[in-house]
A protein has these predicted regions:
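Short hydrophobic/aromatic-rich motifs at helix boundaries and adjacent loops
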Residues: 15-16, 72
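Bacterial N-terminal signal peptides that target proteins for export
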Residues: 2-13
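Absolute protein N-terminus
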Residues: 1, 24-27
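Intrinsically disordered, low-complexity regulatory regions in eukaryotic proteins
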Residues: 26-94, 98-238
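N-terminal signal peptide c-region/cleavage motif recognized by signal peptidases
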Residues: 18-22
Length: 238
């Protein structure tokens, strides 16, 4: 019998649980979300909470259509230089120790990419288990830690537009977190209705606006995860 926790929220760090009998966590991973830096690198620390040596395997999944009902994960072949590479992809974790694992984006990206890297304990470094190890794995919970890794574009562009269908569009090449949308009359910031959003919009994605009848413009306040600052766009609506 194997039980699995369903996805709790989209593009967030996840902890998957396969729990035949006993519930215990034999490792932790920190941090649970990583942004690749300008050198194309990032890292996490895998920390043992076990009294025994563990063998850890990392698997990379590309996240397609993030934060939409069509979101899905596509497994990336280990060592594929066109995607995120984990170093090392497999390793031994001695009791009570920790291990730094590096993420490397091998090629510059034209548009933001997001990955989920899953860390799990396996019976051996070669995934070949003995009967004794098989039994041990069956009698303890197998926790899979899902780390979100964001790779920025080489030349980030933050851009929002209102399209002909009167929808807000991310016309840039990186995600933005929409904080609020102000619907304003008479081209003034003083006569506005404020909508709180606090949701990401990814490159190419659209977002429905509230009724814009009677309004002249919207003021969209956002957070930029790459520069780590806030900004705003004033966009005419007709």
């Amino acid at each position: 019998m194997v039980a699995k926790i369903n996805r709790l929220s989209r593009l967030t760090p996840l902890l998957f649980v396969f729990a035949p009998f006993l519930a215990q966590s034999n490792m932790t991973v920190y941090p649970m979300a990583v942004s690749i830096n300008s050198q194309g690198e990032g890292n996490v620390r895998v920390i043992s909470k076990s009294n025994e040596v563990q063998y850890i395997k990392a698997t990379v999944f590309r996240i397609d259509n993030p934060s939409t009902p069509q979101e899905n994960e596509v497994e990336i072949k280990s060592g594929d230089a066109n995607h995120l590479v984990v170093m090392p992809p497999k390793f031994a974790l001695p009791a009570g120790s920790s291990k730094t694992v590096r993420f490397v984006a091998m090629e510059p990206e034209q548009k933001e990419k997001n990955y989920r890297v899953k860390f799990e304990a396996v019976p051996s470094i070669d995934d070949v288990a003995t009967d004794k190890k098989d039994l041990s794995m069956q009698l303890t919970v197998n926790l899979i830690w899902g780390i979100v890794v964001s790779v920025p574009p080489q030349q980030p562009i933050a851009k929002l537009e209102v399209n002909a269908a009167q929808k807000l569009v991310n016309a840039g090449n990186q995600r933005l977190k929409i904080l609020t949308i102000a619907y304003c009359k008479n081209n003034s910031k003083e006569n506005c209705k404020i909508q709180t959003v606090n949701k990401n919009i990814f490159p190419g994605q659209e977002r429905n606006l509230e009724s814009i009848s009677g309004y002249d413009k919207i003021v969209v306040k956002y957070n930029n995860w790459i520069t780590k600052d806030n900004g705003e766009f004033e966009l005419a609506v007709h």
